[in-house]
Swiss-Prot record:
Location(s) in or outside the cell: Cytoplasm
Name of the protein: Globin-1
Annotated source species: Anadara broughtonii (Blood clam)
Domain of life according to the entry: Eukaryota
Family to which the UniProt record says this protein belongs: Belongs to the globin family.
InterPro entries to which the protein is assigned, alphabetical: Globin (IPR000971), Globin-like_OT (IPR050532), Globin-like_sf (IPR009050), Globin/Proto (IPR012292), Mb-like_M (IPR044399)
Listed CDD domains: Mb-like
Subunit structure: Homodimer.
GO molecular function: heme binding; metal ion binding; oxygen binding; oxygen carrier activity
One term under GO cellular component: cytoplasm
Coiled coil location: none
PROSITE patterns: GLOBIN
Binding site for heme b: H101
Primary site of residence: cytoplasm
Length: 146
C-alpha cells in the first residue's frame, strides 16, 4: 500500500487508542524508549547489527548512545501522534523518518519487527491487543514509506 493508503487505515478509534496509550507510554520517554529498544534486541538479536554505533546494547540505561537513540525514537513517535489529524502532515513526517532507515537499508519487514516489542511494552502498562493493533497500523504507515 501507499503511505497515504496506510495512513487512511488510521480510523478515529485507532487514533483514540494511539493517543490514550501514548499518554502513558510517552510520559517516560527515556524509560519506555530504552525498554522498547532492549526488547527489540532481546527478541530479535539479528537487529543489533543495524545499531553497531550504539556499542554494548546490553548495558541498557547505562549506555549513553542507546539512551540517546531511545529518546530520539520516542520523540519521533510523539511527532507521529501529533500529526494524526492531518494525514498530509503525518505522511511528511513519516517519510522524513523513513529516510534514516532507508539509508541503513532497513526493509519494511525488518522495521516491522518493532511490533513485538511495542506489544510487550504496552502490555507492561496494562494496554492489551486493541492498543498493540493500533500501533501496528501506525507502524504500517512507516513500513509503506520504506
Amino acid at each position: 500500500p501507499s503511505v497515504q493508503g496506510a495512513a487512511a487505515q488510521l480510523t478515529a478509534d485507532v487514533k483514540k487508542d494511539l493517543r490514550d496509550s501514548w499518554k502513558v507510554i510517552g510520559s517516560d520517554k527515556k524509560g519506555n524508549g530504552v525498554a522498547l529498544m532492549t526488547t527489540l534486541f532481546a527478541d530479535n538479536q539479528e537487529t543489533i547489527g543495524y545499531f553497531k554505533r550504539l556499542g554494548n546494547v546490553s548495558q541498557g540505561m547505562a549506555n549513553d548512545k542507546l539512551r540517546g537513540h531511545s529518546i530520539t525514537l520516542m520523540y519521533a513517535l510523539q511527532n507521529f501522534i501529533d500529526q494524526l489529524d492531518n494525514t498530509d502532515d503525518l505522511v511528511c513526517v513519516v517519510e522524513k523518518f523513513a529516510v534514516n532507515h532507508i539509508t541503513r537499508k532497513i526493509s519494511a519487514a525488518e522495521f516491522g519487527k518493532i511490533n513485538g516489542p511495542i506489544k510487550k511494552v504496552l502490555a507492561s502498562k496494562n494496554f492489551g491487543d486493541k492498543y498493540a493493533n493500533a500501533w501496528a497500523k501506525l507502524v504500517a504507515v512507516v513500513q509503506a514509506a520504506l
